[in-house]
Design a protein with these regions (language model features):
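N-terminal maturation segment of proteins
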Residues: 1-178
């Protein structure tokens, strides 16, 4: 299951959804899907060399650190310099990238949180479905259901996965699964 391009294209193809639903973008869902696909890349064995693994872990660390930085700025009142120092000391980002990122977090409160929180939500509802469905769980059906929603608020995703579980993990109507 590829990332943003695939998710966005499938959202646009969902003719059963109203136009505004096909074209709306919720950061938690969209960015969460992007990070989730990086996570499943690990399951699929995409990161084969130590350099690929290091790159993945480096980006994962950056996504975790920005949870702290955004909260530090907007809840604890950190100065720009405190945020820069924290991000620079805990990631592999260049000085230019650190400054650009901190300015983005300052000007767009909470947006940086959406990435990791979205990923964790998708992973959590997947684990819930895997546990509830046991051997009936089918990863393709799960991904089909998630992507058929378009971009939705995370509580809506969770409600749909609860329905997927209640339906016994059937997947999408009209789709023939091998």
């Amino acid at each position: 299951a590829p990332g943003h391009s695939f998710q966005g294209a499938l959202a646009l193809e969902q003719q059963a959804l109203p136009k505004f639903r096909r074209q709306t973008y919720f950061s938690g869902f969209g960015e969460g899907w992007g990070l989730y696909t990086e996570y499943i890349g690990e399951e699929m064995g995409i990161y084969r060399t130590p350099y690929e693994r290091f790159g993945k872990l480096s980006y994962e660390m950056w996504r975790a650190v920005r949870l702290v930085v955004d909260t530090g700025i907007h809840h604890y009142g950190w100065s720009r310099q405190q945020a820069v120092d924290y991000l620079a000391s805990r990631t592999a980002l260049s000085t230019r990238e650190v400054n650009t990122e901190v300015d983005r977090y300052i000007s767009w409160p909470g947006q940086a949180l959406a990435y990791k929180l979205g990923e964790l939500t998708i992973r959590r509802v997947r684990a819930k479905a895997e546990q509830a469905l046991g051997p009936k769980f089918d990863i393709r059906k799960f991904h089909d259901v998630v992507l058929s929603l378009g971009s939705v608020p995370l509580p809506t995703l969770e409600e749909r996965i609860d329905a997927f579980i209640a339906d016994g993990g059937q997947g999408l109507p009209g789709v023939a699964y091998p």
